[in-house]
Amino acid sequence: MLKSVIENVHALEIFDSRGNPTVEVFVTLSNGVVGKAEVPSGASTGENEAVELRDGGSRLGGKGVMNAVNNVNTEINDALKGLDPHDQPNIDATMIALDGTPNKGRLGANAILGVSMATACAAAKDNHQPLYRYLGGTDLEMPQTFHNVINGGEHADNGIDIQEFMITPVAKTSFRDGFEKIVNVYHTLKKVLEDMGYETGLGDEGGFAPNMKNSEEALKALHESIIKAGYKPGEDIAIACDCAASYFYNKEDGKYHLEGKVLTDEELADYYDKLLDEFPELISMEDPYDENDVEGMVKFTESHKDRIQIVLDDFICTNPKLLNKAIHEGAGNASLIKLNQIGTVTETLETIRLSRKNGYNTMISHRSGETGDTFIADFAVAVNGGQLKSGAPARSERVEKYNRLLEIEEELGKGERLAFFPDNVDLD
């Protein structure tokens, strides 16, 4: 039997959940097998992310991706024809070399990632395996999920500076049972917000976007909703935040402008401590300091690493070199993993391996601009990612990922393990 090789790589411009253009890629093998992938994009982006190539000009507000599409259909297609789709490192290395820039700025990370993901999907189909099994083998775990149910910052047009308020099931049950708890709290939260007099319109990630006065009010609403849904805060359902501090950090004065206050590093830590003391079910914070505020992040890590999970997003941008730097500096204790921040499946896996090797937890993440693509659901299971965040249990581009996880759990059977919150974080 002849070994299948890549016969054709084709891309087209489609649209994401925010109505912005993005890239869809089809990789066709010599035996007719086709793998497909759709690339997400972020609203809150780190300075060191791989370059998402946009066309500029007047068409579609300058956000068109036809240049990236054309790069796939010409240069990348020509370079990958005849290559083995099962050799993911070689596929990705070929595209990186072809691009020739340190940030994938010539061909576009959105072009390269689409091909990288679609190739993995084609290879899995060629092996007659689901993607999670092809990438991950046999020793698999279902991830613990984090759900952004109150949106602020860059994800909503309201007065809340902190970007995401998430809930996560910590009771040791099946993924389905945990997700049902989340759905119950989500619907309860809607009523709680209505009773508080707030609008319940949705933000980019399916969470509510009430025009609240401050973050404390958002946390109180979550706390009340958990209880009213019949659960115990911290025991059944916990809370996590993505602070996205780079978006309220002022580069001119080197301080944090948060909720009408101007705070130093130390004062910001005091602000966080107040929230942690008032809401002990708050167990994880992402990007509590600006991505360039190394001193602030390191000091916060030193004083809080045994109390909460400190997730690095903009600080490392899923880049193994930046993660290695953060590890040596002593910043954070967990890595947020976004495929489109680095731009290939292979490099993403490298960052995950480096995280694990150094005792950092990993959280696989969606982006605010999503599609119906479910790659990250399979990916989170395949790499035993431990944690996954993909928005609220609302809006189809978010729920698609969770529905895919329900399918995977059904396929794996009840004998498979469920990943829970890391043991090094004390929920008491």
From Swiss-Prot:
Catalytic class of the enzyme: lyase
Entry binding sites for (2R)-2-phosphoglycerate: Q163, K338, R367, S368, K389
Entry keywords, A to Z: Cytoplasm, Glycolysis, Lyase, Magnesium, Metal-binding, Secreted
Main subcellular localisation: cytoplasm
Tagged with keyword Zinc-finger: no
Cofactor binding remark: Binds a second Mg(2+) ion via substrate during catalysis.
Any single GO BP term: glycolytic process
Residue ranges of the region described as Disordered: 38-58
Cellular compartment(s): Cytoplasm; Secreted; Cell surface
SMART domains: Enolase_C, Enolase_N
Catalysed reaction, written as an equation: (2R)-2-phosphoglycerate = phosphoenolpyruvate + H2O
Pathway it works in: Carbohydrate degradation; glycolysis; pyruvate from D-glyceraldehyde 3-phosphate: step 4/5
Enzyme active site: E205, K338
Cellular component terms per the entry's GO annotation: cell surface; extracellular region; phosphopyruvate hydratase complex
Entry-linked Pfam families: Enolase_C, Enolase_N
GO molecular function terms listed in the Swiss-Prot or TrEMBL record: magnesium ion binding; phosphopyruvate hydratase activity
E.C. number(s) listed in UniProt: 4.2.1.11
CDD domains listed in its UniProt record: enolase
Domain of life: Bacteria
Binding positions for Mg(2+) per the UniProt entry: D242, E286, D313
Cofactors that this protein relies on: Mg(2+)
NCBIfam families with a match to the protein in the record: eno
Family per record: Belongs to the enolase family.
Function: Catalyzes the reversible conversion of 2-phosphoglycerate (2-PG) into phosphoenolpyruvate (PEP). It is essential for the degradation of carbohydrates via glycolysis.
The protein's name: Enolase 1
Natural source organism: Lactobacillus gasseri (strain ATCC 33323 / DSM 20243 / BCRC 14619 / CIP 102991 / JCM 1131 / KCTC 3163 / NCIMB 11718 / NCTC 13722 / AM63)
Lineage of the organism: Bacteria, Bacillati, Bacillota, Bacilli, Lactobacillales
Gene name of this polypeptide: eno1
